Regions:
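Solvent-exposed loop/turn and edge beta-strand elements of beta-rich ligand-binding domains
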Residues: 1-321
């Protein structure tokens, strides 16, 4: 997961010796947030809640003293002039654990990629931008620590060691794909008892992954099986399809002794947890009064840890009416 900005860490590793100018501990500070939207332009249209916790007071020399729940041995602020980015990431993670269950000092909401918090007291702050969802992706942010005031001494060549009370930080998100499901409903109008008490119907699910270009990226198969036959509805759920993908579903095996009355159907996958999820398609079959035999198989497909689709998970249901 990417960190808020390398500049944030540089602001906090400034040795005491460089703080020739005293901190005005009574000054009012401003904290500005900017989200990188060049790579992920849909972030321009997403609101991102941010919780901000005061972790420590700062003295005139730039030293920090932890406050409240953050005054804990798990968070070492005694040597803030030392440590690389990884160590500051660990400090932020420790502060995030200590902040659990506590009320933030203040909050912000990033809209249009920007937010501004004014009239903040000086000190060291933990910033936690919350996960934000678009219809197709989740954007996550690592917690980080920021000093108010900040200092540009190590960030810009030739910069002075003046303290900066109007601070701007950039947020860089990690983007992960959201997944949705497809419900395939089989409505058996008339059962064919000639072929016994079981019937299996197989469906091809052609997936055009988001962003869609009108072509099939891969095809998966799912089945609905009736046991102890009774006319009515049964369904199966195909999981782990990228949200926003277009799926075209067709019945490729109509069951022994049955005919399909429904042509192929198309749906756009909605992310799990959203309104109208999961999307659904319905196929109707009726008996053709023949002795045609046959069988069906169901493949189970599961996405790997990198989001690649070797397979798509299928959850069958035996619900019948």
């Amino acid at each position: 997961m990417l960190l808020a900005s390398a500049l944030v860490f540089a602001a906090m590793v400034m040795p005491e010796a460089q703080a020739a100018v005293a901190v005005d501990v009574n000054a009012s500070c401003t904290l500005n947030f900017q989200v990188e939207t060049t790579t992920f332009d849909e972030l321009d249209n997403i609101s991102i809640p941010v919780n901000i916790y005061k972790v420590a007071d700062i003295d005139v020399s730039g030293n920090y003293t932890a406050v409240d729940v953050f005054d804990d041995e798990s968070l070492d602020l005694s040597s803030v002039s030392e440590g690389n980015a990884a160590e500051w990431e660990a400090r932020a993670a420790a502060a995030s654990v200590l902040a659990e269950g506590t009320e933030p000092t203040t909050t912000a909401t990033i809209t249009g990629g920007e937010a501004k918090v004014s009239n903040m007291n000086t000190g060291l702050y933990l910033v936690e931008a919350q996960d934000a969802n678009s219809p197709y992706y989740t954007y996550s942010f690592s917690p980080y620590l920021i000093s108010l005031p900040d200092n540009a001494y190590y960030k810009v060549d030739g910069a002075t060691d003046d303290w900066i009370y109007n601070v701007t930080v950039g947020l860089k998100p990690e983007q992960t794909v959201r997944y949705g499901s497809l419900e395939i409903v089989k409505n058996l109008l008339v059962m064919n008892t000639i072929m016994g008490n079981d019937a299996t119907f197989v469906f091809a699910v052609n997936v055009d992954e988001y962003p869609c270009d009108g072509t099939t990226d891969y095809t998966r198969y799912a089945s609905v099986t009736y046991q102890e036959l009774a006319a009515g509805a049964a369904e199966t759920l195909v999981n782990n399809i990228p949200a926003g993908s277009t799926v075209t579903v067709s019945e490729v095996y109509t069951g022994s002794g049955y005919e399909c009355l429904t042509g192929e159907q198309t749906q756009i996958i909605v992310a799990d947890g959203e309104e109208n999820a999961p999307v659904s398609v319905t196929f109707e079959n009726t008996s053709d009064n023949t002795w045609n035999g046959g069988s069906g198989i169901e493949n189970t497909f599961i996405a790997d840890e990198n989001g690649a689709f070797g397979d798509v998970d299928v959850t069958p249901s035996q619900k019948q009416n």
